[in-house]
From Swiss-Prot:
This is Lysophospholipase ARB_05919. InterPro entries: Acyl_Trfase/lysoPLipase, LysoPLipase_cat_dom. One of its GO terms (cellular component) is cytosol. Glycans are attached at N142, N176, N195, N293, N466, N472, N482, N503, N524, N533, N552, N597. SMART domains: PLAc. PANTHER family: CYTOSOLIC PHOSPHOLIPASE A2 (PTHR10728), LYSOPHOSPHOLIPASE 1-RELATED (PTHR10728:SF33). It is found in: Secreted.
Amino acid sequence: MMFIPATLGTFVLASLLPATVGAGIPNAAADVAVRALPNAPDGYAPAEVDCPSTKPAVRSAAKLSQQEQDWLKKRRMKTTGAMADFFSRVKIEGFDAVAYLVGNADNVAKLPNVAIAVSGGGYRALMNGAGALKAFDSRTDNSTEPGQLGGLLQSATYLSGLSGGGWLLGSMYVNNDSTITELQKGGSNSLWKFNRSILEGPDDGSSGVVDTAEYYKEMIKEISRKKAAGFETSITDIWGRALSYQLINAPKGGPAYTWSSISQNSKFQSGDVPFPLLVADGRNPGEKLIGGNATIFEFNPYEFGTWDPTIFGFVPTQYIGSKFEAGTLPSDEKCVRGMDNAGFIMGTSSSLFNQFALHLDSQDLPKVVKDSLRDFLSSLDEANNDIAEYKPNPFFGYAKSTSPFAGVKSLPVVDGGEDKQNIPFHPLIQPARHVDVIFAIDSSADTELAWPNGDSIIATYQRSLNSTGIANGTSFPAIPDNNTFINLGLNHNPTFFGCDSSNTTNPTPLIVYIPNSPYVTHSNVSTFNLKYNTTQRDAIILNGYNVATMANATRDGNWPTCVGCAMLSRSLERTKTAVPDACKQCFKMYCWDGTLNSTKPDVYDPKLFLTEVDLQSAAKGLHASGKLSLVAAVVTLLSILLV
């Protein structure tokens, strides 16, 4: 029997809405301790609380928050030691990098300020990004051996993600800085059990298969409590709850776990981990398309807001459910906490269902399915249920002369990659953060066969040139066109952009662009594929590890040295230190030199660099396999939402 949306909706409602709601479903992984902080006052439902003595308010984005400034003092000290450890293993011929770091340790502003950005792209981005972070993490077995890059993560000040990359960050941080190894190990007892899609629900680890109806009942129960408390709900609520069951190690998907609670984690407070940043886009009232001048929002443990001139302001993350007006809380309003549910924040950064609705005609689906989905999604769009709704709008009445959101009671937010900036550069190129180098992990599906072709990094460069002034003082290195990316192999191998800082007027970070490429498996799986067996999951993570290390430096024995040179480059400029000859050779090898080749290339179909991993029952090159998975997701989740 084949269900069309209306039939499936009736079926779902009939089977998932009994008179009483049953007990919760545990989701515990044997090797990942439950260490995050479930500090929401009333589970998933936001609730009023007493305000602190100084009431929260919108602040200008003219500088970093005082909290971030104080945190940076701790983190930069930790990264100095981590970089010294890194360079004790990664050598630069003719240059003592450790002595250089020690000699400038009295002024951390002289030292490298490193950031890592993990792109969107669903589970593909999560797994490929996980492989890179696993390679960069000195806690990973053998990652500090010759040819490896372990310690780069510990050397980073900032770590940004959006969509699938945001899921990766959320799963790591909400589970108290768990390693990728911890998240994936344990087979059937691992936290990352992607062999059961979020449509089915998690495996409870004892009976083998959890009851799917019970799983949906629990999600409906929590979301209904939020709605009963007077807050808007949308598809992002059910999406975020479903993601939480798979990514957060807590019973019922951790409904009380918040994004702001990361700031209360002891590892974060002591500066032992990078500063996590999630990115999402604002959708202007009355619009459906997300353009290059869309307002870009960031979620960090302390604040939510934007550096863009439209709003240029931030509010405390833990209080985003409060009824701010013109930047302050009225005297008769209490504070509200709990709106920043960790799953809802991760879901916000990946709320791409409205994007799917806009591209139905390009999908290889039966006409009856397209028509039914279009009607279904259109009915939701009329009520703005296809996006994440932040109501009350924390920026209501704020920046009235410039903000498209100042006059609306609800702030509509969507997937951070919908403006084509699928790599979350935006929070890292803000002048106030003084980032020197960004290691950009690009898992985008730009080409016909779902490999990157530079679209994301090009979009950020184009935004920096936007005549509307939306870039607001940010600077970005020159980037070539898509065809040049493919013709010159810039999407096939790591490439440095912005090597010569004299080519830009304002300080600009060096970009180390690391595109998804096939090493041991075809990792070009669909953004909309929701299910992977453990073998394929581990193969894609291993592939990402090889992408980041260039096959443990077997493709280029100097790759670790060149990574080190990229880290040091801007710092050497600031201290007027001569660039080592070894680094000059690296820059000659990896820097884009401005050459263009814009002729139309053949279909980009890269071959494996190494011996292919045996995927057993997993399919190879699943770049087109996710369409019906997303159809099922949309139909099922929206049916539930319309209760």
